[in-house]
């Protein structure tokens, strides 16, 4: 009987700390839980939360969409570029078809999302397949959204969802002190950086 040596232990690469806002922004899409959709107009429909988090300041931008597509992703980029007060150098996403054609038969053809990134001079970085931990900041924020927002809210229309999501993000997330930021809020970190320029 042959004895096989044990598999080598996986050693993750050290995390690359960002040095300034806009250096890299993580983007992902969250499916809104169907339990939050209680009106006959919205039962059976699907709503989506697009989320972007700046890795340096943890500043977050969210937007509600009725579809999960490369068109919605391109629209989200346009709104993110207008909302973020600094130049965006890189956007990191997973391998979803709303972001890339990497695992489709059109792999060489850029998506509308990628074309919009190119128009703004933004580099697109995709994470390794099946490694959501590489987009950990945005994934963690989605878990917090489940606890703080979706567990306690109902939506009676798409407009109602979009309005409540906007209020929640403005009130709760960007003004919430965070330990990795030295107990400052994302808005405070961004303001301090912009004042130092």
Feature locations, PLM:
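An active-site-proximal beta-strand-loop segment
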Residues: 27-60
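Acidic beta-strand-to-loop metal/phosphate-binding motif
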Residues: 88-98
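Short small-residue beta-strand/loop micro-motif enriched in glycine and branched aliphatics
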Residues: 59-63, 125-127, 151
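Basic, flexible linker segments flanking DNA-binding modules
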Residues: 1-33, 37, 97, 108-114, ...
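Short, solvent-exposed loop/turn segments at secondary-structure boundaries
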Residues: 64-65, 101-107
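RNase H-like two-metal-ion nuclease catalytic core shared by retroviral integrases
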Residues: 93-95, 104-107, 112-117, 122-147, ...
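Active-site beta-loop-alpha junctions of metal-dependent nucleic acid enzymes
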Residues: 45-46, 62-90
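C-terminal domain-tail junction helix/linker
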Residues: 9-16, 23, 120-122, 143-197
């Amino acid at each position: 009987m042959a004895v096989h040596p044990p598999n080598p232990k996986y050693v993750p690469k050290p995390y690359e700390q960002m040095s300034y806002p806009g250096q890299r922004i993580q983007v992902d899409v969250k499916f809104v839980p169907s339990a939050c959709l209680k009106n006959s107009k919205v039962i059976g429909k699907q709503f989506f939360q697009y989320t972007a988090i700046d890795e340096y300041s943890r500043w977050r931008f969210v937007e509600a969409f009725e579809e999960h597509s490369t068109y919605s992703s391109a629209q989200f980029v346009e709104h993110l570029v207008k909302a973020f007060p600094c130049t965006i150098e890189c956007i990191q996403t997973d391998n979803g078809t709303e972001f890339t054609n990497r695992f489709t038969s059109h792999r060489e053809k850029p998506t509308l999302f990628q074309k919009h990134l190119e128009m703004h001079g933004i580099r697109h970085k995709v994470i390794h397949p099946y490694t959501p931990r590489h987009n950990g900041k945005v994934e963690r924020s989605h878990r917090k959204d489940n606890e703080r927002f979706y567990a306690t809210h109902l939506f009676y229309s798409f407009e109602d969802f979009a309005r409540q999501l906007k209020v929640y993000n403005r009130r709760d997330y960007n003004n919430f002190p965070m330990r990795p930021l030295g107990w400052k809020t994302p808005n405070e970190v961004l303001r301090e950086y912009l004042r130092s320029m």
